[in-house]
Amino acid sequence: LNIELEAGRAFGSGSHESTAGCLFSLLHLFKIISPKRVMDLGCGSGILSIASVKLWPLAKTLALDIDYDAVKTTLENIKVNKVWRQIRCKHSNGFPRARPGTSKKYDLIVANILAKPLVALAPHSSNFLRSGGHIVLSGLLRTQEREILAVYNSLGFRLVSRKRLKEWTTFILKYKRT
């Protein structure tokens, strides 16, 4: 994937193991799915949003971050990579507020954030992910794997793939509505 990137003050140059794990996971998913709607939760520099639309040019991606600098950096990187038609970027403290009557779900959610927010956001994940959809979780240490898997398994998610790079782990999980 050819991505021009200025990380600025935002996380996500591609060199950190958690970001690299997400990129490996997107390449793995590229072989088996073709999502129409993607959410990048904690977009940082926008690298994962940009990678998703380079892999799936017809996909629409929503990039969200709690940090205003990250949103600004993502918007700049979207322009540099000429993918502004496919990616919307917004400031958000977690998942976006669902508008009444909106039932559009995502086929793929990527969340490269830390374990604690991944646990806190877990119960809301199924509200935004369609049954049969995938979620990529990263930003967690090997020592946190069991806790994260237990929480997501209890909500109907099943492990598809685990990628370990040094002490960092990235999961691909598939959601099945029960």
List each model region and its residues:
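Nucleotide donor/acceptor-binding cores
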Residues: L1, P35-R37, G133
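S-adenosylmethionine
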Residues: A59, I66-R177
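A short, charged helix-loop
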Residues: N2-A7
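Conserved SAM/SAH cofactor-binding pocket of Class I
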Residues: R9-G94
